[in-house]
Amino acid sequence: YSVKPGQTFKKPAGSLTVTQIINATITKLGKADLPKALNISEKMPKDIVDNTPTKYNPETEALDYWESLEGMRVEVTKPKVTGPQYKGDIYVLPGDYKGQKLNNIGGVNLRPGVQNTEVLPITVGNKFVAKAKDYFNENITGVVTYKNKTYKIDPIDPNALKGLLQDGGLKREVSKIYPSEDKLTIASYNIENFSANNKGHDETPEEKVDKIANSFIKEVHSPDIITLIEVQDNNGGVNDGTVDGVKSGEKLAQRIKSLGGPDYKYTEIAPVDGKDGGKPGANIRVAYLYNPKRVTLIGKEKGGSEEAARFVNGHLEKNPARIDPKSVHFEKVRKSLAAEFEFKGERIVVIANHLKSKLGDD
């Protein structure tokens, strides 16, 4: 788009303004210690976001409170982490805050009509690893800013945060369902943008492959059938028209076997390039791992990318098959995948889903 003299451009709606100083001239008048950072624990308004949009009430309304602190140094007392890092931020609760109780896994429960405005985002970067129940053993000082439609705190010394973080002891849950000769076990597992590509920016690191494979064996006890969510094509986010993801699925299956798990088989139907949403070029899809010593995938012919599943005489005509892939309800989203298996002489149809889960999903 060419810009012409006299044209006016406005900032897109939906974000608040941030105070800026433009073309400033700085004059040094002397030296002084920085003022003490404001400890925010006691004065944070609880639950109310903005009940009176036309009035400024920082004492009672969270939006106005954070606006009053924009650009200021603040201190958070020994923050408690309420969940893992997400898009470079972790969400914390001040360690001395009395107005909110954490649940048994260190998170904050959603309640009707309550916004949990006392949970604070702190900028830590995309490589920072933390989990619920972890905590910092010292106070964190930072500057309040506004980014991506939310107020957050930028730490004064972000490099020091890793050394202050303490393990809260939260362990990944282990399934209480164990294999049984006469019972079929099925699991659904989001493997989070998994591909056979282990090089470059769009890689799936080998450590991640090991972690997921071990999870299948030790935490969910090697289910007979696994519906996989977010299997990428063979080269991940490389946007070159590749849609086949068999190498991605088989890499995971082979790693499970090498670590002592079952010799799973993999099946999928590749999507049409760029039609199922997710990361551009990665073509995520749902797929299946199944243990051929326990179940049989019925039939030999599978459906096509744009071919709808048909149930004929009590069975899938093609197997596996995508459910109504041309429907307007499945535009730019993962198509559900049906698969028919036989277990102990009985047939069962399993449907793998990965539906939209957030407003920003494409």
List the predicted regions and their residue ranges.
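Extended non-catalytic accessory segments flanking core domains
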Residues: Y1-K199, E203-S222, L316-H329, V333-K335
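A residue-level signal for conserved active-site and pocket-lining positions in enzyme catalytic cores
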Residues: K78, G142, N190, I226, ...
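Beta-sheet entry/capping signal
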Residues: T150-K152, K183-I186, D224-I225, D263-K265, ...
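Solvent-exposed loop/turn segments at secondary-structure junctions
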Residues: V3-T8, V81, I191-A196, V231-N235, ...
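A short local loop/turn or secondary-structure capping micro-motif enriched for an aromatic residue
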Residues: L161-G163, E306-A308, S357-G360
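Active-site surface patch of divalent metal-dependent phosphodiester/phosphate bond hydrolases
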Residues: A213-R322, K326-S327
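Beta-strand-turn-beta hairpins that frame and shape the catalytic cleft
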Residues: K176-I186, P292-T296, K332-L359
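Residue-level preference for long, well-ordered alpha-helices that form the structural scaffold
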Residues: H201-K208, G241, G245, D362
